[in-house]
Amino acid sequence: MSTLKKPDLSDPQLRAKLAKGMGHNYYGEPAWPNDLLYIFPVVIVGTIALCVGLAVLDPAMIGEPADPFATPLEILPEWYFWPVFQILRVVPNKLLGIVAMASIPLGLMLVPFIESVNKFQNPFRRPVATAVFLFGTAVTLWLGIGATLPIDKSLTFGLF
């Protein structure tokens, strides 16, 4: 049994749409009832089973009790705040750091308008969005890794 319906390439309307680069949603199984009644419950039950299984097999360990009089040498935020922490740590002017962080969502809001002429959903046929995504991912990883290092090695990772 296959989850995808093969397109009927003898259909002239479908061939015309595919020749224009359109028609990628023209064929396939309908969402109702196939996805909503059969696939979604399996995914939901599987997710719940995975969470319960991981909770049973590897329960969270309770750490040492907090000591308010013994602070660590370097206090780091949670891992998902490391890139933002690195921006605020490296940029000399804190207002400039906040402006840099606020410009990221504003820049991401511009990507659909830049690519509004592009009708393709394939990421290989959308070079601007793909380049923005890959550059943003690389910069985020670079900032996140750099936040865990001392300030003098944080931008170069100590390689230079």
Swiss-Prot record:
Component of the cytochrome b6-f complex, which mediates electron transfer between photosystem II (PSII) and photosystem I (PSI), cyclic electron flow around PSI, and state transitions. Its main location: membrane. GO terms for molecular function: electron transporter, transferring electrons within cytochrome b6/f complex of photosystem II activity; electron transporter, transferring electrons within the cyclic electron transport pathway of photosynthesis activity; ubiquinol-cytochrome-c reductase activity. GO terms for cellular component: plasma membrane-derived thylakoid membrane. It comes from Trichodesmium erythraeum (strain IMS101). One of its GO terms (biological process) is photosynthetic electron transport chain. InterPro entries: Cyt_b/b6_C (IPR005798), Cyt_b/b6_C_sf (IPR036150), Cyt_b6/f_cplx_suIV (IPR005870), Cytochrome_b_C_euk/bac (IPR048260). It is found in: Cellular thylakoid membrane. This is Cytochrome b6-f complex subunit 4. The chain crosses the membrane at residues 36-56, 95-115, 131-151. The gene is petD. It is a multi-pass membrane protein.
